[in-house]
């Protein structure tokens, strides 16, 4: 039912309203982190089914050119969603999207570039046509977990370090990153 509603909305925006800017669609935010809490009943299998359903509904409406982005997960550390998206949804998800909040010191040591290069390498091993993006990227220093705010974004260095992290990310072969928290 949810996939039908989403596909109807995308169809309305593209066909009725003439929006040509919709090229990709992300179904959910940090779903892997939600699934890590067993109390909510969410899982990889449920998300996978929703992605397959969405692809089917978009295709039924002639929206085959709208790419699905995923898994839109939190940092991949021990997370299996990255691998499962590459292997189980290979033909359905052409854009691999994750979120990452780094410590500013990681830019000094090129840790950002090293880790994103590794992430890109594993993506390329599976499918060289896939694209990697950071759907959210920012600096963790000063993050208030309770209020979910970046308390240091007004410091002169915040934007500088985000820009440095973005440059390292692009050097490693990634296609894009969205700076998150620059306007908190």
Question: For each of these PLM feature ranges, what is it?
Answer:
Residues 134-184:
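Aromatic/acidic polysaccharide-binding cleft in carbohydrate-active enzymes
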